């Protein structure tokens, strides 16, 4: 007599979690961080048509890592939910926390009830309405419906440990856009260097997708950053850093010349 195959619920959840984590880890990394002017999204994405970063509503943005078809379905569902609620009630009734909760409930239901979980990790971010002085809100939603409120930055997909470590060492609150972009790009390069060989080129602007939620814009805060804009911002940061590094040298030279002149006057 053959017995039916049995698997405990705990083992089933472990296997689903492992499947989802492996699928997310195969994807490219995404970083979202708060800066002085709002929220910056930067994703490692060489494709020009398949986008990981999107607008959900007036002041709310979206970024994802994992399987594109799965998180794109979630993105479109979030846009439809936000549009319907904003039309039925008021545009200010659509918030990032509300959309993050909807995504958490959806992913939690899929994880427990469907045969296969979604291999995705999401970030929902919101900036304050124009004229309000409220800090940006960042929410991370994982494959099993878990939701977390992150105060400064979110790292998803790929190899997250070196990127998170780099951000912990370099992130500064209220940085301007060039500095924030430089911090995010350097962190992503740390993650790509962990996975690549020595002969592979450094992660460049051509392989990046970026956008911001601009808190200083009156209504729709979402704005994509073109690759030419990224190059300009990174060059601006490099020139500022080089200027700052030259200032201490000039002050030291001034002190040395001052000492020499004092010695000459005593003679």
Swiss-Prot record:
PROSITE patterns xref list: PROTEASOME_ALPHA_2
Keywords: Cytoplasm, Proteasome
Gene3D superfamilies documented for this protein: Glutamine Phosphoribosylpyrophosphate, subunit 1, domain 1
Subcellular location: Cytoplasm
GO biological process: modification-dependent protein catabolic process; proteasomal protein catabolic process
Regulation of protein activity: The formation of the proteasomal ATPase ARC-20S proteasome complex, likely via the docking of the C-termini of ARC into the intersubunit pockets in the alpha-rings, may trigger opening of the gate for substrate entry. Interconversion between the open-gate and close-gate conformations leads to a dynamic regulation of the 20S proteasome proteolysis activity.
GO CC terms, sorted: cytoplasm; proteasome core complex, alpha-subunit complex
Protein's name according to its UniProt entry: Proteasome subunit alpha
Species this protein is from: Mycobacterium marinum (strain ATCC BAA-535 / M)
Taxonomic classification: Bacteria, Bacillati, Actinomycetota, Actinomycetes, Mycobacteriales
Gene, per the UniProt record: prcA
């Amino acid at each position: 007599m053959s017995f039916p195959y049995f698997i405990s619920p705990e083992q089933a959840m472990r296997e689903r979690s492992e499947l989802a984590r492996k699928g997310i880890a195969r994807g490219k990394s995404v970083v979202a961080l708060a800066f002085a002017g709002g929220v910056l999204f930067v994703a490692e994405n060489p494709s020009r048509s398949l986008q990981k970063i999107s607008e959900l509503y007036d002041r709310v943005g979206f970024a994802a890592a994992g399987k594109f078809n799965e998180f794109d379905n979630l993105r479109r569902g979030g846009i439809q939910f936000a549009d319907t609620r904003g039309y039925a009630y008021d545009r200010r009734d659509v918030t990032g926390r509300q959309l993050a909760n909807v995504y958490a409930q959806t992913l939690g239901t899929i994880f427990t009830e469907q045969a296969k979980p979604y291999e995705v990790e999401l970030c929902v971010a919101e900036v304050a309405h124009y004229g309000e002085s409220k800090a940006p809100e960042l929410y991370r939603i994982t494959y099993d419906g878990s939701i977390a409120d992150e105060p400064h930055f979110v790292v998803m997909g790929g190899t997250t440990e070196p990127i998170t470590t780099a951000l912990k060492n370099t992130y500064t609150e209220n940085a301007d856009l060039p500095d924030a972009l430089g911090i995010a790009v350097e962190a992503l390069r740390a993650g790509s260097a962990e996975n690549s060989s020595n002969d592979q080129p450094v992660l460049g602007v051509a392989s990046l997708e970026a956008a911001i939620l601009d808190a200083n814009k009156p209504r729709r805060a979402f704005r994509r950053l073109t690759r030419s804009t990224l190059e300009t911002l990174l060059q601006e940061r490099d020139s500022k850093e080089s200027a700052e590094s030259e200032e201490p040298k000039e002050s030291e030279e001034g002190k040395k010349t001052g000492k020499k002149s004092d010695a000459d006057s005593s003679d």
